[in-house]
């Protein structure tokens, strides 16, 4: 198994900004959210299964999934969320493993929004948390997704707390400021992870 840095953070924390910065340095990024989105693209069997289960009204005229409508449907129906997870999670895990096997960079950045909630941090060598204040999360998510404050507050209430994420963190990037401040933090961590990955490889060798 390649040395793995798990990246997590709450909604609106800026995980994509951070993961893009690592990708720019040549690091393989495996993003659970991106894999999940690919699973429900038009033509995928999973999208057909979702349409059959929830109804064709969740499919837009262009054949794509109406994600917001699906989110709203499962948010207030735990049993529907459980059904969707049972459908998607095995496929996401399978694709994640495939991408790990194909990775070529010295270490892999594994982006997992629900790392703490699903206790997946146990599968990583190191945990990097993108940290912002709850108020920053609210403002960014409202602007990005064009949703109400109440909607975002419901999402935040369902996610792990800021304290719970920080409790499992080995490294933290403070993303409350300007996005261009991220690059220097990522460069510093990248240098550290290269050393750790090298040590990991030498320990793995017989």
Curated annotation (Swiss-Prot):
<protein>
    <recommendedName>
        <fullName>Dephospho-CoA kinase</fullName>
        <ecNumber>2.7.1.24</ecNumber>
    </recommendedName>
</protein>
<keyword id="KW-0418">Kinase</keyword>
<feature type="domain" description="DPCK">
    <location>
        <begin position="4"/>
        <end position="200"/>
    </location>
</feature>
<keyword id="KW-0547">Nucleotide-binding</keyword>
<keyword id="KW-0173">Coenzyme A biosynthesis</keyword>
<keyword id="KW-0808">Transferase</keyword>
<feature type="binding site">
    <location>
        <begin position="12"/>
        <end position="17"/>
    </location>
    <ligand>
        <name>ATP</name>
    </ligand>
</feature>
<dbReference type="GO" id="GO:0005524">
    <property type="term" value="F:ATP binding"/>
</dbReference>
<comment type="similarity">
    <text>Belongs to the CoaE family.</text>
</comment>
<dbReference type="InterPro" id="IPR001977">
    <property type="entry name" value="Depp_CoAkinase"/>
</dbReference>
<dbReference type="GO" id="GO:0005737">
    <property type="term" value="C:cytoplasm"/>
</dbReference>
<comment type="pathway">
    <text>Cofactor biosynthesis; coenzyme A biosynthesis; CoA from (R)-pantothenate: step 5/5.</text>
</comment>
<keyword id="KW-0067">ATP-binding</keyword>
<keyword id="KW-0963">Cytoplasm</keyword>
<dbReference type="Pfam" id="PF01121">
    <property type="entry name" value="CoaE"/>
</dbReference>
<dbReference type="GO" id="GO:0004140">
    <property type="term" value="F:dephospho-CoA kinase activity"/>
</dbReference>
<dbReference type="InterPro" id="IPR027417">
    <property type="entry name" value="P-loop_NTPase"/>
</dbReference>
<comment type="function">
    <text>Catalyzes the phosphorylation of the 3'-hydroxyl group of dephosphocoenzyme A to form coenzyme A.</text>
</comment>
<dbReference type="GO" id="GO:0015937">
    <property type="term" value="P:coenzyme A biosynthetic process"/>
</dbReference>
């Amino acid at each position: 198994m390649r040395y793995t840095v798990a990246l997590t953070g709450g909604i609106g924390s800026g995980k994509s900004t951070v993961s893009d910065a690592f990708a720019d340095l040549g690091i393989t990024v495996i993003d659970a959210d991106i894999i999940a989105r690919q699973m429900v693209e038009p033509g995928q069997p999973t999208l057909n299964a979702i349409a059959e289960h929830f109804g064709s009204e969740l499919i837009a005229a262009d054949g794509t999934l109406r994600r917001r409508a699906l989110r709203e449907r499962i948010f207030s129906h735990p049993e529907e969320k459980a059904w969707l997870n049972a459908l998607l999670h095995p496929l996401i895990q399978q694709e994640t493993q495939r991408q790990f096997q194909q990775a070529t960079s010295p270490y892999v950045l594994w982006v997992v929004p629900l790392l703490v909630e699903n206790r997946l941090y146990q599968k990583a060598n190191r945990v990097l948390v993108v940290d912002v204040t709850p108020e920053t999360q609210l403002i960014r998510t409202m602007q990005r997704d064009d949703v109400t404050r109440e909607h975002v507050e419901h999402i935040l209430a369902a996610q792990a707390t800021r304290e719970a994420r920080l409790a499992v963190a080995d490294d933290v990037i403070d993303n409350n400021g300007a996005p261009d401040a991220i690059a220097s933090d990522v460069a510093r961590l990248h240098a550290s992870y290269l050393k750790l990955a090298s040590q990991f490889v030498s320990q793995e060798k017989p």
